């Protein structure tokens, strides 16, 4: 854009912005704001400033436009204007402000009953906040997944679910990841995506075993038997064998099972967990990043047995003394 055209757009924007400010305020002669006319003025001003790349003024006008539209009870348009204001904040490198405005837009979408748009906007805000506030990012992504499922927009929820679960696992929030996988299973059932359902079920059981909770893994396995296709699937068979191996403290069995190619088709984070899954030499329970070999496990068992045998003569001697 030439300097002359940019100057003209700036002048145009300033003119309409002043008009919008005037119409949206009351005075001694105007007891009620003219929101309709103010909205038209702010929209023209915002577009003019945006064309001239005067982003701070454009952001102000989009915010005022959203306010006008809220007073006019057109919440969908108010949400779109708030999104535009967020885009201007992004141009200004105001990351936190950009995310905050997206969340305000999300509220307006939800007020209007647009859960899908709210979830999509929430996902955008979460991505911006990942390096600023991890906990808020995870909460926003989780809420977005729930909104997608609530609005029956299951076909559009896959990427958000995948991104959120992967992030939860990356930051070792295993309980939250499992909860979200259980929610995602409902989506897979609705969409009749049995293959993805089976992978999700195996992932849940793998993570449960990795967090020392064999009881939970058994509970989940019983729950997943409600899916008729799971028990006959390769994932279902693998899950059952893995639980049995842990139940029997079969170190070699666990190593052989987790080395199967099937785990490579799970989420990358789950595949990493599965690769390092083994039985702890100390507690005989599954642990993440445990590398206890079978020989150590055998030595531990032998030591325990020997200690028990060594204690028996002493106990017998005490008993004999009591009799005497």
From Swiss-Prot:
Biased composition (Polar residues): 285-298
GO CC term, one of those recorded: phagocytic vesicle
Biological process according to GO: intracellular protein transport; vesicle-mediated transport
SUPFAM superfamilies attached to this UniProt entry: TPR-like
Its membrane topology: Peripheral membrane protein
Amino acid composition bias (Low complexity), ranges on this chain: 299-312
Stretches the record annotates as Disordered: 285-324
Keyword field: Cytoplasmic vesicle, ER-Golgi transport, Membrane, Protein transport, Transport
Pfam families registered for this protein in UniProt: SNAP (PF14938)
Subcellular location per the Swiss-Prot or TrEMBL entry: Cytoplasmic vesicle membrane
One Gene Ontology MF term: syntaxin binding
Protein family per UniProt: Belongs to the SNAP family.
SUBUNIT field: Interacts with nsfA and probably SNARE proteins.
Record function comment: May be required for vesicular transport between the endoplasmic reticulum and the Golgi apparatus. Involved in vesicle fusion with nsfA and probably SNARE proteins.
Protein name from the UniProt record: Gamma-soluble NSF attachment protein
Organism per entry: Dictyostelium discoideum (Social amoeba)
Source species taxonomy: Eukaryota, Amoebozoa, Evosea, Eumycetozoa, Dictyostelia
Gene that this polypeptide is encoded by: snpC
